[in-house]
Amino acid sequence: MGKQGYGIDPERLGDYARQIKEVSEMGVQIGIVIGGGNIFRGLSGSQKGFDRVKGDQMGMCATVINSLALSSALGAVGVKNKVLTAIRMEPIGEFYTKWKAIEAMEQGYVCIFSAGTGSPYFTTDTGSSLRGIEIEADVMLKGTRVDGVYTADPEKDPTATKFDAITYKEVLARGLKVMDLTAICMCQDNNLPIYVFNMDVVGNLKKVMDGEEIGTLVHN
């Protein structure tokens, strides 16, 4: 989480917290799913000899560490928040239920959803889709280091061009790596639009909420 590509960067974390605060003050109800790849990835761990289930469980724990770090950063800038975990681990976080999350967001809390889905073999993307559908979100914002969806990986192909909007059907037909297949199909089936944008540019989150077209909308 930061410039070094691993571990937790307090400066980057502070940037995220301030951006989230800005949007929260607009009256937007916010639920956040955070990954754990800066600490451990279950799939890559299994390729190095770890049991896949154990590896994924380690990855879930990594998301909890990141969630606690983000919670602390949000608290430092005055944003009330709750960490909700897919696996029981009180008092580190509250055990997630849809109703608990919705109630907290209606009370003005930013909810941070951690530990993925609570089950192995599911990615952070799938966990994000699941939580977005469960809490009946209007849109899922996918903050990445790229400013949208391209015809190819722009970090590898300089001729890649960006989409302002694209349908789920076209994403699947082109085999674009917006999210994993399970996550894409879940969003498509439940009519949850995704907006992909570069979260690492300070101020971009508010621009998205203000309606500026700085990323790519994926929709039915």
How should each PLM-predicted stretch be described?
Residues 1-220:
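C-terminal catalytic "cap/lid" subdomain
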